[in-house]
Amino acid sequence: MEMISYYAIKSSSDLAKERGTYSSYEGSLWSQGIMPLDSVSIVEQQRGEGYIEVDKSMKMDWDALKKKVKTQGMRNSNVMAIAPTATIANITGLTQSIEPTYSNLFVKSNLSGEFTVINMHLVDALKEIDMWDEVMVYDLKNLNGSLEGINRVPEEIKKLFATSFEVEPKWLIESASRRQKWIDQSQSLNLYISDPNGKKLDVMYRMAWLKGLKTTYYLRSRSATTSEKSTITNLELNAVKSAAQAPEAPSACSILDPDCDACQ
């Protein structure tokens, strides 16, 4: 993220040298040599020591870039933001921007209709260990796209393909905090919580504030009640191959039998 930020700002400054700065550049934070990372210190001064916890480490030469920006200016007043890309991601077969996988198998509805979204990376991983079959599809449907209740799936695959409600919100917030310091605008960060209550929400949003997030986007929670799947029993038996016998053909008379009244 640091590299993307660095070269995005550098490119805007180089464009300013070629085509001129944006109209209100003078007096802006850019004109003062204040980069997104520097704004963390400004927030810390406003709040007081101990009221913001953001990692300030860097690897690139930001002092040189500050001098370039102050000398050449900026072509763009706003350079970076992270937007939600849910539908676009579904169309291209990718995950949503900075989001964890919502579900490994679900049906999405929008103005264009309904379509099924499946995590093809999971499909490939299960094929490698000969576990992608009709039974697995059945289990994923019944468990709302989660692998947690499927005992035959190895733990390492469950961890790798954990869905958004199976990832602790603190990790999403911490990741967002490390991105935010490089972004001059903001990011659309959705938060997920399985069993919401006042205490959990208080802790979660206090942490987001403490970690220097400018904002959050949707808070998504699971419904307190779900419809009962009446055809589901113990999923542990789904992977057991049944010794089903081929059905016997029904008895029927021969069309060549001259004594059959139905064939006359």
Protein language model regions, located:
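Active-site Gly/Thr loop motif
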Residues: G48-D63
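Extended, well-ordered alpha-helical scaffold/bundle regions in very large, multi-domain proteins
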Residues: M1-D38
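Polar, glycine-rich mid-to-C-terminal structural blocks
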Residues: I34-G50
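Hydrophobic alpha-helical packing residues
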Residues: A8-S12, L65, R179
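Acidic, low-complexity intrinsically disordered tails
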Residues: S230-Q264
